[in-house]
């Protein structure tokens, strides 16, 4: 139930971004903020951002002409939750993500959040992760 609610909220948020981008010519730039956290508490279990929760809104916005930058608290390569890369979690968006060399290169060198100027962006989006 939580997952359905989360995706419903995510879809509504993305829809608002899209509607605003279509209706407001100046809305063209969104900052995606993903985690730098790579371990789940003191369990030693690897974690990071969830690929589908990043990829679905990323491509929805990108395909509407929105420019997207990516930042993390520490800058650099954000960790991906290994469970999100399981074949059972694959979707069209995650397959596109895996094949997107331009995006994968961008993710290797994300901006450090402290260095981001908020006035450069029309919106900020936080994909899921720990």
Segments (PLM) and residue ranges:
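Bacterial Sec-dependent N-terminal signal peptides
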Residues: 1-25
